Amino acid sequence: MTSPLRLCVRRSTAPDAEGAATLVTLRLPSDVTCIEEAVELVTRHCLAGHAATRTIRFRLQVVLSEALANAILRGNRESLDKWVDIRAELHDEVIRVHVTDQG
C-alpha cells in the first residue's frame, strides 16, 4: 500500500522573501496512525544538512506530534475525508511550524 502522505521539500541557498532556507510541506489524512510517519518525514527533511542537537530534534518531534494529534482528534474529529496540512520553515535560528486542519 502506498502512503497517503503528500510531501514537498524546497531548499534554498538564498533564503526566500520570508527568510526560509528550507520549507517542508506535508498533507496527511485525519488518521492518528499517520502521525508517527509524518513526524519522522518532517523532522528528517526539515533538519537535513543542519547541525541540530538531539534536544532540538526531540522538541520538534514533540511539537509536531501534539499539534497533529490535536488537529486530527479535536479539529477534524478523526473524519477520514478531511486533511491536515503541515508547513515547517527552517530559518537561520528559528523553526516555524504551522499545522492546519479542516475543522
Model-derived segments and their meaning:
Residues 40-65:
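Conserved short strand/loop->alpha-helix "switch" segment adjacent to the catalytic nucleotide/phosphoryl-transfer site
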Residues 65, 69, 73:
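Short alpha-helix lining the ATP-binding pocket of the histidine-kinase-like ATPase
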Residues 1-25, 29, 72-103:
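Conserved beta-strand-loop-beta-strand hairpin that lines the nucleotide-binding pocket
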